[in-house]
Amino acid sequence: MAKPKKKVTRIRRRERKNIERGHAHIQSTFNNTIITLTDVHGNAISWASSGQLGFKGSRKSTPFASQMAAETAAKAAMEHGLKSVEVFVKGPGSGREAAIRALQATGLEVTMIKDVTPIPHNGCRPPKRRRV
C-alpha cells in the first residue's frame, strides 16, 4: 500500500509595513475586549482580544485581560514600525482605561483619546435589569 505524500507547507512571513502613525480601536463590551490597531486609512495592522489570549468566561471582561490584549496587539504592531496612535474607545466595558494604559506602557505614544460609543436616540429596548 502506498504511503500518502506529506504536504510541505511553508509559513509565509508577512512583509514589514513601515507605518509610524495609526489608530487604536478599543471595543470593550460587558463580555470581552477587542483591540485593533490600524493605519490612518483603517487597514488593520494587528489585533488581539481577551478571548484570543485564552481567557474564558467572566475572566474575559476583566481589566487585566484587556491589558494583556492591548500589550499583545501593540507589540505586534510595533514590529511594523508603529510609533504613535490615536485611540478610539467604544463600549461600556471595564477594560477601557486598562487597555489605554497598556498601550502607553508598551511604548506607543497616545496622541488623542476619543469616545465613539454609539448612543441611541431611543432606539432598541435595553435588556431587563439584573436581580442578584
UniProtKB/Swiss-Prot annotation:
Keywords of the record: Ribonucleoprotein, Ribosomal protein, RNA-binding, rRNA-binding
The UniProt record lists the keyword Ribonucleoprotein: yes
GO biological process: translation
GO cellular component annotations of the record: ribonucleoprotein complex; ribosome
GO MF annotation, one: structural constituent of ribosome
HAMAP family in the record: Ribosomal_uS11 (MF_01310)
Family that this chain belongs to: Belongs to the universal ribosomal protein uS11 family.
Function: Located on the platform of the 30S subunit, it bridges several disparate RNA helices of the 16S rRNA. Forms part of the Shine-Dalgarno cleft in the 70S ribosome.
Protein name (Swiss-Prot/TrEMBL): Small ribosomal subunit protein uS11
UniProt source species: Clostridioides difficile (strain 630) (Peptoclostridium difficile)
